[in-house]
């Protein structure tokens, strides 16, 4: 029986969406499976209480932490994945990040590819995701352009496709004053559809509801808007929403994946549900009926570092008793997501800026200024905006609202990131107990989508969906001393510049502290490498153990770096797509 599709892609986030966009435009027959619907376009997209206190766009799935306590992940299951609610900061990893780096807490290992291998794809990713940035009056250097702002910026073969966003008054004042102290600052590269020269013609309105919010006006460059909606109408593309992949099925020898098992939820009949693969018996019935089976020549798992590992572990069979691609026992291990926290810098000066995420510094990225501590610290950037409702969840119970409101008008929120290091004991495991039944979103039609169809995007009725067994996320923080030094360094800079009378960690008032629940930067659970004994994937992101299985999301990361991972995920998906088209899908 011929395969139904050339490639089946599981997940529509930064990796899956980009891979689908690239392969579909090359004319390949693509099946795209997304476990969630299209995110509803509604007023609540920009409602701070709904987004941050009610967790309207997070799954109701319950995971476990290392001790078995309940964990409520800030995970979004929609077309576009986590990019629907990300902050759109589009950083290239530093060239040094691809090599071995000694940290105070240990080694950040080398990748099997170099920055030079990735650079052309970074350039293409910046074009696809409409990235604004500025290298300044940088001289030409080998390979292209350097940066006159950021000494750590690697070479670019081309300048940014769109100009950087300008500062508003408060952020301009702070930037001027920290520069007087000798701090190098740079414009943050942002994936936003902003027209600074003609704001009236701009999709992006520089609102104060960007970081962590869905974009009501679709001005944020995400994998849904920039990728999936550009290809879903093509005759060679089948997009199925509300369709959760539960298992990958292999041939009798276990050398290749033959099919994906899918549970559809919601109205409508899923396309191809009666088909069965050649080398497997019918799967067991589920609570929603028999799972659908889809065959393809190649399979790309792009469900995010947690769920990609979960799918491989859940696909264990006689030939792969510990999970697919897990001969090395590395699937699920080396989970990373950054040591990161938000810091409120409070001063007597008022902050009336709407959007503050316009500049940052990497002066502490590669080294601490203290010569007795010759280790990297990390990156500093502002948060896009801050609302006092974000503090209401855990503020002291008698704190008056006007106090929180006053803090909002005198605070600038900063986001500090230090690399966390791969640790095999920081891992995802799947306990094959009775699945935990949860309430999750139901909006949109099941099955193939015609041109322009995004389902009933204003419906928001919860339905019952099952988590795939019990997911356990075991994590012990590392590199903490470097992170604490980074916070101290930045607070000291702000105080010397006159822009921080005091400071408080935002998690002191945030309903959910960033550790563990905040899995937006998840990576590393299916690391790539040349040695099958110590890695899951080869340098092209193909599983060492199976000939036609790829994992194309942040799971493949060997190290986390200290920058937002989105652009690297996108660029790597383009790199893998080129490999597939040149070498495998002829």
Give the ranges of each region predicted by the language model.
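Short hydrophobic beta-strand that contains or immediately precedes a catalytic carboxylate
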Residues: 32-33, 239-240, 551-552
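Conserved redox-cofactor binding core of oxidoreductases
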Residues: 102-245, 518
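Glycine- and acidic
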Residues: 104-107, 155-161, 209-215, 295, ...
């Amino acid at each position: 029986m011929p395969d139904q599709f050339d490639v089946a892609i599981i997940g529509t986030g930064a990796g899956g969406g980009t891979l689908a966009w690239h392969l579909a435009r090359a004319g390949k027959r693509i099946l795209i499976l997304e476990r969630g619907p299209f995110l509803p376009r509604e007023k609540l997209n920009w409602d701070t209480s709904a987004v941050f206190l009610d967790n309207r766009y997070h799954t109701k799935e319950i995971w476990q932490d290392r001790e078995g306590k309940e964990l409520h992940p800030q995970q979004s299951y929609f077309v576009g994945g986590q990019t629907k609610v990300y902050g759109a900061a589009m950083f290239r990893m530093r060239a040094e990040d691809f090599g071995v780096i000694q940290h105070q807490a240990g080694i950040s290992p080398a990748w099997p590819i170099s920055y030079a291998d990735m650079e052309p794809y970074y350039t293409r990713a910046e074009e696809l995701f409409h990235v604004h940035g500025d290298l300044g009056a940088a001289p030409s250097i080998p390979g292209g352009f350097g940066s006159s702002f950021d000494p750590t910026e690697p070479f670019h073969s081309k300048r940014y496709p769109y100009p950087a966003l300008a500062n508003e008054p408060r952020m301009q004042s702070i930037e001027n004053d920290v520069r007087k102290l000798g701090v190098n600052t740079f414009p943050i590269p942002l994936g936003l559809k902003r027209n600074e020269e003609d704001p009236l013609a701009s999709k992006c309105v520089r609102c104060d509801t960007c970081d962590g919010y869905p974009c009501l006006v679709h001005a944020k460059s995400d994998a849904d808007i920039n990728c999936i909606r550009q290809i879903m109408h093509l005759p060679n593309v089948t997009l199925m929403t509300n369709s959760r992949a539960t298992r990958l099925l292999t041939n009798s020898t276990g050398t290749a994946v033959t099919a994906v098992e899918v549970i559809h939820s919601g109205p409508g009949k899923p396309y191809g549900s009666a088909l069965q693969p050649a080398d497997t018996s019918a799967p067991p019935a589920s609570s929603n009926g028999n799972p659908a089976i889809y065959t393809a020549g190649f399979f790309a798992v792009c469900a995010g570092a947690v769920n990609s590992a979960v799918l491989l572990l859940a696909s264990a069979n006689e030939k792969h008793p510990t999970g697919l691609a897990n001969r090395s026992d590395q699937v699920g291990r080396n989970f990373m997501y950054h040591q990161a926290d938000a810091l409120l810098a409070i001063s007597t000066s008022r902050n009336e800026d709407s959007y503050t995420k316009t500049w940052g510094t990497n002066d502490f990225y590669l080294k601490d200024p203290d010569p007795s501590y010759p280790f990297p610290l990390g990156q500093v950037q502002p948060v896009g905006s801050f609302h006092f409702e974000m503090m209401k969840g855990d503020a002291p119970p008698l704190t008056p609202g006007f106090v929180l409101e006053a803090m909002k008008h005198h605070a600038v929120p900063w986001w500090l990131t230090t690399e966390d290091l791969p640790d095999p004991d920081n891992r995802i495991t799947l306990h094959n107990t009775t699945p935990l039944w949860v309430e999750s979103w139901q909006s949109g039609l099941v099955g193939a989508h015609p041109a322009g169809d995004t389902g009933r995007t204003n419906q928001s009725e919860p339905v019952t969906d099952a988590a795939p067994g019990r997911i356990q996320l075991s994590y012990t923080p590392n590199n903490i001393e470097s992170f604490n030094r980074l916070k101290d360094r930045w607070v000291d800079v702000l105080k010397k510049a006159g822009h921080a009378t005091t400071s408080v960690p935002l998690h002191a008032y945030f309903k959910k502290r960033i550790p563990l629940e905040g899995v937006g930067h998840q990576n590393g659970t299916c690391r790539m490498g040349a040695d099958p004994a110590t890695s899951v994937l080869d340098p092209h992101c193909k599983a060492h153990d199976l000939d036609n299985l790829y994992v194309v999301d942040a799971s493949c990361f060997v190290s986390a770096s200290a920058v937002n991972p989105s652009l690297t995920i996108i660029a790597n998906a383009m790199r893998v797509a080129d490999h597939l088209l040149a070498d495998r899908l002829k």
